[in-house]
A protein has these predicted regions:
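Conserved ABC ATPase signature
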Residues: 154-158, 162
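P-loop NTP-binding/switch modules centered on Walker-like glycine-rich loops
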Residues: 180, 184-268
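ABC ATPase NBD coupling module
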Residues: 79-98, 124, 244-249, 279-284
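Short catalytic/signature loops enriched in Gly
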Residues: 239-320
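Conserved ABC transporter NBD signature motif
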Residues: 67-79
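A short, proline-enriched helix->beta-strand linker immediately N-terminal to the Walker B motif
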Residues: 173-177
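Conserved ABC ATPase "signature" region
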Residues: 79, 131-149, 258
Length: 320
């Protein structure tokens, strides 16, 4: 049995490459990071950097064109990458880990009542009766702030915010230790986004659930983050506790990301990152951010290792 001092999740050298007509897409390319019990990690990065592929690699929700899938994923100290697909489905996915996919509110079945959909994972993974599953779904609705009467409604009868809450309830109904959320507020208005993050904080406090939150919404995610992982071109370039990251990020890419966020106070205008991210079909040698980095020097032609600085991890020669 794992202790509270042991990490809930530890990822080592995780690789996920896709085969396409143009070549191999290196979506996740040697990722390492971890997550403690009852901890919220926010994964930041531009669109196309591999964040969603990382989530699907952890959950083993893979398309047919996978070319390379390797590495180690330890959950409660067990390497679940060693599990066969059926064993992983029965013991891990929707049992210990669950997923709220991007645009989840649009993934609800329009011809089934919302309550039946929320209860379904519990029926299939735990074998409980529909009555028991509906009771748990009712409890989850209360937890995420959805009126009990909405159990008998269809998805098209709910607002976008309520559908998103229902999707979160579905991910929580089996009481997993880890929930991975992929852009859970991307299609919602600002007020609804704030309400969803308040729901997530409330759940974390009441259920002691750990989160991996994938987003490019830096400002809103800072309300929930305890740890921040920054992804660029398929690699983790910085991992830090949230207060240190938002006060003084270490990696040049992280600095540019924070400088792109509009400020309510002061006269400083948002900055932008010059250039385009590299293609994951043929990422450059050396540092993958070097073409856009204002601090580039000769050493950047070599692949930087991950350095430890003040308890934080950064993949940059500036901190050698």
């Amino acid at each position: 049995m794992m202790t509270s001092d042991s990490p809930l999740l530890r990822i080592e050298d995780l690789v996920l490459h896709f085969k396409t007509s143009k070549g191999s897409v290196r979506a996740v390319d040697g990722v390492n990071f971890g997550l403690d019990f009852n901890e919220a990690v926010v994964v930041l990065g531009e669109s196309g950097c591999g964040k969603t592929s990382l989530a699907r690699a952890i959950l083993r929700l893979l398309p047919r064109n996978v070319e390379d899938f390797s590495g180690r994923v330890f959950l409660n100290g067990k390497n679940v990458m060693a599990y066969k697909d059926e064993e992983f489905r029965q013991k891990v996915r929707w049992q210990q880990m669950s997923f709220v996919p991007q645009a989840a509110m649009n993934s609800l079945n329009p011809v089934l009542k919302v309550g039946d959909q929320v209860a379904e994972p519990l029926i299939f993974t735990r074998g409980v009766s529909k009555q028991e599953a509906m009771q748990q779904a009712r409890h989850m609705f209360q937890l995420v702030g959805v009126p009990e009467g909405f159990l008998q409604r269809y998805a098209f009868e709910l607002s976008g915010g309520m559908r998103q809450r229902a999707a979160i309830a579905m991910a929580l109904v089996t009481t997993p230790e880890l929930v991975i959320l992929d852009e859970p507020t991307s299609a919602l208005d600002v007020l609804t986004q704030a309400n969803i993050f308040n729901v997530l904080k409330h759940i974390k406090e009441n259920m002691e659930t750990s989160y991996i939150l994938i987003t490019h919404d830096i400002a809103t995610s800072s309300e929930l983050a305890q740890k921040v992982a920054v992804m660029y071109a398929g690699q983790m370039v910085e991992i830090s506790d949230a207060p240190s990251f938002f006060h003084m990020p270490l990696h040049p890419y992280s600095q540019k990301l924070l400088n792109s966020v509009p400020r309510l106070h002061g006269d400083k205008e948002p900055d932008f990152i010059v250039g385009q991210p590299p293609s994951l079909l043929s990422p450059p040698t050396g540092c993958r951010f070097k073409a856009r980095c204002p601090f580039r020097f000769e050493k950047c032609e070599q692949e930087p290792p991950t350095f430890m600085k003040d308890g934080r991890l950064v993949k940059c020669w500036l901190h050698a």
